[in-house]
From Swiss-Prot:
It is found in: Cytoplasm. It comes from Shewanella frigidimarina (strain NCIMB 400). Disulfide bonds: none annotated. Its EC number is 2.7.4.3. NCBIfam families: adk, PRK00279.1-1, PRK00279.1-2, PRK00279.1-3, PRK14527.1. Residues 122-159 are annotated as: LID. This is Adenylate kinase. It catalyses: AMP + ATP = 2 ADP. One of its GO terms (molecular function) is ATP binding.
Amino acid sequence: MRIILLGAPGAGKGTQAQFIMEQYGIPQISTGDMLRAAVKAGTPLGLEAKKVMDAGQLVSDDLIIGLVKERIAQEDCVKGFLLDGFPRTIPQADAMAENGIEIDHVIEIDVPDEEIVKRMSGRRVHSGSGRVYHVVFNPPKVEGKDDVTGEDLSIRPDDEESTVRKRLGIYHEQTKPLVDYYGKVAAEGRTQYNKFDGTQSVTKVSEQLASVLK
C-alpha cells in the first residue's frame, strides 16, 4: 500500500500518519529523515546531497527522487510506504511518475486556514518542562502560567500567527495544486484520491481512513 498524505501544516497529518503506520505496518518516509539517513550512511547519493547542503543550496528534485527510489527499495517497504512531505510540487509529482513510482492512495486532510491558525497560534509552551497548553482546547489554570511551576508560558516562533499564515501561504501556492493533479490522476484510474474533513475528531478521521484503505 503506497500512500501520499497531503494537508496543510497543522491539519493533523502527523497523528493520522502514526495511525496508518501502526495499522498497516508500513514505514513513514519523510524527505528530511531520508536525507539525514543517506548522508549518515554515506551512500553515493547521500554524499552528493551532503555536498549540496554544505554549500547552502537546495537539494534538486532529481537527487530527492533518487533517494526516494533508494529508500523504497529497502526491505521494510515491501508492504508499501507512506510519503510525508513529498512530493511538494507538480514537477516532483511528474518526476515520480516518470521514474515508475506508483501510488495507490492519495489522502488529503482538509482543514480551513482559520481553524489551523486557531489551533496553532493558541499553543503555549512551558520551556522548562516542554508542557504544552492551548488557550482554547487545553488552557492552563491561570492564564499564561504553567500549572505546575507557575512560571510564564511562551509562544514558539513556529506558532506565531504571522509564521503560521506564511506557511499556509506557501502550502497553497506550492502544494495545493497537487490536489488537482492527483484528482486528475485518480480520474484516469491510476490512483485513488480521498479527502477527509480534518476538523472532525482524530478517531473519526482514523475510522474513515481505515474504511478507505482496507
